[in-house]
């Protein structure tokens, strides 16, 4: 179960991160001595609920994905990419 998996993760320091998806919400937390990251949805997002008593609904937020790169100097690097057409601005306007 969950406790056994947590023990395995804790006992294997080479595990840099646990990556998963399909909760329709981008979530990141520490567990078993490593970072767990849930990718955002590719289709529709759920409203942010911080406990099980809050109403669960879907919301029309930008969808996206996580892009991971491994770098010998930095290790695992993650970028979030949102899908859609958004207005772009040049640096001179900022």
Language-model features and meaning:
Residues 1-16:
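Active-site-proximal segments of metal-dependent phosphoesterases and phosphodiesterases across multiple
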Residues 8, 26-94:
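Binuclear metal-dependent phosphoesterase catalytic core
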Residues 14-24, 37-39:
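Active-site neighborhood of phospho(di)ester-bond hydrolases with catalytic His/Asp-centered motifs
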């Amino acid at each position: 179960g969950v406790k056994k998996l947590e023990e395995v993760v804790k006992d294997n320091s080479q595990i840099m991160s646990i990556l998963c998806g399909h909760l329709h919400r981008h979530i990141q937390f520490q567990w078993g001595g490593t970072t767990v990251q849930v990718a955002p949805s590719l289709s529709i997002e759920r409203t942010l609920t911080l406990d099980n008593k809050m109403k669960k609904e879907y919301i029309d937020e930008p969808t996206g994905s996580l892009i991971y790169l491994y770098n010998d100097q930095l290790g695992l690097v993650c970028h979030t990419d949102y899908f859609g057409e958004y207005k772009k601005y040049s640096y001179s306007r900022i």
